[in-house]
Swiss-Prot record:
Source organism phylogeny: Eukaryota, Fungi, Dikarya, Ascomycota, Saccharomycotina
Name of the protein in question: Autophagy-related protein 29
Additional detail: Kluyveromyces marxianus proteins are shorter in length and have a more ordered secondary structure than their S.cerevisiae counterparts, which might contribute to the superior thermotolerance and solubility. K.marxianus could be therefore useful as a new model organism for further elucidation of the molecular details of autophagy.
Principal cellular location given in the protein's record: other
Organism: Kluyveromyces marxianus (strain DMKU3-1042 / BCC 29191 / NBRC 104275) (Yeast)
The organism's place on the tree of life at top rank: Eukaryota
């Protein structure tokens, strides 16, 4: 169905009321939808919206703009809902901090400060072990060294001279 060559006629039973004026035809498209959404999404409250001015700017009747606004809000809320349901769970600030801590620890493990690799269990101490042959790796660290997160942070601060 093409907007340019399709006309719809609606027959309403009864007489036209006195003073009835046919609404002016108008064109609506994505560009105007975007303008409408930009205007309505920024308003603080319903009283802030000047519908008459918006009607003049967009060249559409007030009733159409209100219905279209409702549809746009509904569409954006649905998209937001889908985004929230797609993510497994919302991240709390604690989760974010823990992931940052783990990233810092992993970076420390790969840095020159610590030559050995560590397995990082959740919020526990880090144990390093030498290879299976108990060969000296050239490091001062012994095979059963246990390092806490705060010790790693202190080592980093010393290294960075902070």
């Amino acid at each position: 169905m093409n907007n340019e060559n399709t006309k719809v006629y609606i027959r309403v039973s009864g007489k036209r009321p006195e003073g009835f004026i046919d609404p002016k035809p108008f064109e609506w498209g994505f560009k105007r939808d975007k303008i409408l959404w930009t205007r309505i999404s920024k308003m603080e409250s319903l009283e802030d919206m000047d519908w008459k001015e918006l009607c003049q700017d967009l060249g559409a009747p007030e009733s159409f703009l209100k219905k279209r606004s409702y549809m746009l809000f509904q569409k954006h809320l649905k998209l937001l809902s889908e985004q929230m349901s797609d993510s497994p769970r919302m991240r709390s600030p604690l989760d974010t901090r823990n992931s940052v801590d783990e990233t810092i620890l992993q970076n420390l493990q790969a840095s020159k400060i610590l030559n050995n690799r560590f397995d990082v269990p959740n919020n526990e101490t880090l144990d390093t072990t030498t290879n299976k042959n108990n060969e000296e790796s050239g490091s001062d660290l012994s095979s059963s060294l246990s390092v806490s997160k705060s010790a790693l942070e202190d080592a980093l601060m010393d290294r960075l001279q902070l």
